[in-house]
């Protein structure tokens, strides 16, 4: 599987993402700078990693979505390419119009950095096929603007089209306000595009892929990608 990670000024999770992709897929991704105007040929996957692109000036993801490389990422996605956006990458995807909704300031107005539980809401995607439907996975979050918002019509469409990939939940899989760390509507932690080839999610699966790091809750996401795209 050939993959590339987009690196912006302020990105800080590109090496974690590269390690996870290499560990599970056996091949290191290419790093692509934000000022580039084209993606490498022959890619199967483009990743927008976490961090604070352009220092989160204006608002999280706003400047990243308007960087030179995003035109190429948009063309790649529109041509049916697979794109994964994690944390700041999810924010960029919504700002770029590749996913619906917006990521707002957390409910309590504080930066959140801790492990959370996610419930897998669909396995009909190249990002979740190695999970079990309804499986609960423990993964970290680290964000200030992770409160997913969309209007009622968009939320209904996401649900009707089975495009909610992950919801925040308690350890037993119960979904509710108490287990949603940032106030996201419908406890949404990750969503898919209409063609199911673009995934945006706030939690960081790349940080829990091997037991030595404290767990493997994120590993099945990378297994899904490798098995689906190789």
Curated annotation (Swiss-Prot):
Q: Where is the active site?
A: 87 (nucleophile), 204, 206
Domain of life, per UniProt, equals Bacteria
Q: What is its main location?
A: cytoplasm
Q: Name one GO cellular component term.
A: cytoplasm
Q: Which UniProt keywords apply?
A: ATP-binding, Cytoplasm, Glutamine amidotransferase, Hydrolase, Ligase, Nucleotide-binding, Purine biosynthesis
Q: Which EC number(s) are documented for this chain?
A: 6.3.5.3, 3.5.1.2
Pathway annotation: Purine metabolism; IMP biosynthesis via de novo pathway; 5-amino-1-(5-phospho-D-ribosyl)imidazole from N(2)-formyl-N(1)-(5-phospho-D-ribosyl)glycinamide: step 1/2
Report any one BP term from Gene Ontology.
'de novo' IMP biosynthetic process
What the entry lists under CDD domains is as follows: GATase1_FGAR_AT
Quickly give the catalysed reaction. Answer: N(2)-formyl-N(1)-(5-phospho-beta-D-ribosyl)glycinamide + L-glutamine + ATP + H2O = 2-formamido-N(1)-(5-O-phospho-beta-D-ribosyl)acetamidine + L-glutamate + ADP + phosphate + H(+); L-glutamine + H2O = L-glutamate + NH4(+)
Q: Where in the cell is it found?
A: Cytoplasm
Checking Pfam families in the record gives: GATase_5 (PF13507)
Instruction: Note the PROSITE patterns from the entry.
Output: GATASE_TYPE_1
Q: Where is the Glutamine amidotransferase type-1 domain?
A: 3-230
Record-level Gene Ontology MF annotations = ATP binding; glutaminase activity; phosphoribosylformylglycinamidine synthase activity
What does this protein's UniProt record list under function? Part of the phosphoribosylformylglycinamidine synthase complex involved in the purines biosynthetic pathway. Catalyzes the ATP-dependent conversion of formylglycinamide ribonucleotide (FGAR) and glutamine to yield formylglycinamidine ribonucleotide (FGAM) and glutamate. The FGAM synthase complex is composed of three subunits. PurQ produces an ammonia molecule by converting glutamine to glutamate. PurL transfers the ammonia molecule to FGAR to form FGAM in an ATP-dependent manner.
Binding partners and assembly: Part of the FGAM synthase complex composed of 1 PurL, 1 PurQ and 2 PurS subunits.
Q: What is this protein called?
A: Phosphoribosylformylglycinamidine synthase subunit PurQ
Origin species, per record, is Rhodospirillum rubrum (strain ATCC 11170 / ATH 1.1.1 / DSM 467 / LMG 4362 / NCIMB 8255 / S1)
